[in-house]
């Protein structure tokens, strides 16, 4: 079973933003959508352009679904599972994320 890996302190991520981190050799976009300890993690790679940009995308909520819009062409990816809301064949990898004792952790 995979271990939880410490990534950063929750206070290192401003509310309503995302950051990029390395988990092994994979770039992961970690999002903190609210002023709370809730975090989400998906691949940082935009599958439409194979660019490392999703962590800089715009976080929004629609009909109870949190998503991030790619800064390139604005395709939306659900934070809960990485599903591309415009075209499911371009979904991105989702990572288990949590905050424990003020530290953001990813399962890897």
From Swiss-Prot:
Transmembrane segments: none annotated. It is an enzyme of class 1 (oxidoreductase). One of its GO terms (biological process) is nitrate assimilation. GO terms for cellular component: cytoplasm; nitrite reductase complex [NAD(P)H]. The keyword NAD applies. Keywords: Cytoplasm, NAD, Nitrate assimilation, Oxidoreductase. It catalyses: NH4(+) + 3 NAD(+) + 2 H2O = nitrite + 3 NADH + 5 H(+). GO terms for molecular function: 2 iron, 2 sulfur cluster binding; nitrite reductase NADH activity. The keyword NAD applies. Pfam families: Rieske_2 (PF13806). Its EC number is 1.7.1.15. It is found in: Cytoplasm. Gene3D superfamilies: Rieske [2Fe-2S] iron-sulphur domain (2.102.10.10). To B.subtilis NasE. PANTHER family: NITRITE REDUCTASE (NADH) SMALL SUBUNIT, PTHR40562. Required for activity of the reductase. Associates with NirB. This is Nitrite reductase (NADH) small subunit. It comes from Escherichia coli (strain K12).
């Amino acid at each position: 079973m995979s271990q939880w890996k410490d990534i950063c302190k929750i206070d290192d991520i401003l509310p309503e933003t995302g950051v990029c981190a390395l988990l092994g050799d994979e770039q992961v976009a970690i999002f903190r959508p609210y002023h709370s300890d809730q975090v989400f993690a998906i691949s940082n790679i935009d599958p439409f352009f194979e660019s490392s940009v999703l962590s800089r995308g715009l976080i929004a909520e629609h009909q109870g679904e949190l998503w991030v819009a790619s800064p390139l062409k604005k395709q939306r990816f659900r934070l809960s599972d990485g599903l591309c809301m415009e075209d499911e064949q371009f979904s991105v990898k989702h990572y288990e994320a949590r905050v424990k004792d003020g530290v953001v952790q990813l399962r890897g």
